[in-house]
Amino acid sequence: MPQIKSAIKRVKTQNATNKRNASELSKLRTAIKKFKNAVETDSKEDVSKLHLEAVRALDKAASKGLIHKNKAARDKSRLTKLANK
């Protein structure tokens, strides 16, 4: 347990950031799972809408530093490949 005032504050902010990041990553994973489920069920109109949502979620995560920009690009490429099948 930290004793210094600034260290105590830092622990509080780290915990808040950790919760926020976990929530954002969960939203990202959910968007990707919804898209993949739509691809498996072959619902064309849902696929295009959910593809946009998944790509948007990846871009947001990359811009916030939750995932690396190259991982976002790789995942977007894979999702687009699935959408075009």
From Swiss-Prot:
Record's compositionally biased regions (Polar residues): 13-22
Transmembrane segments: none
Function text: Binds directly to 16S ribosomal RNA.
InterPro entries cross-referenced by the UniProt entry: Ribosomal_bS20, Ribosomal_bS20_sf
Organism: Lactobacillus acidophilus (strain ATCC 700396 / NCK56 / N2 / NCFM)
GO cellular component, one term: small ribosomal subunit
Keywords noted in UniProt: Ribonucleoprotein, Ribosomal protein, RNA-binding, rRNA-binding
Gene Ontology terms, MF aspect: small ribosomal subunit rRNA binding; structural constituent of ribosome
Protein known as: Small ribosomal subunit protein bS20
Highest taxon of source: Bacteria
Positions of region (Disordered): 1-22
Similarity-based family: Belongs to the bacterial ribosomal protein bS20 family.
GO biological process, one term: translation
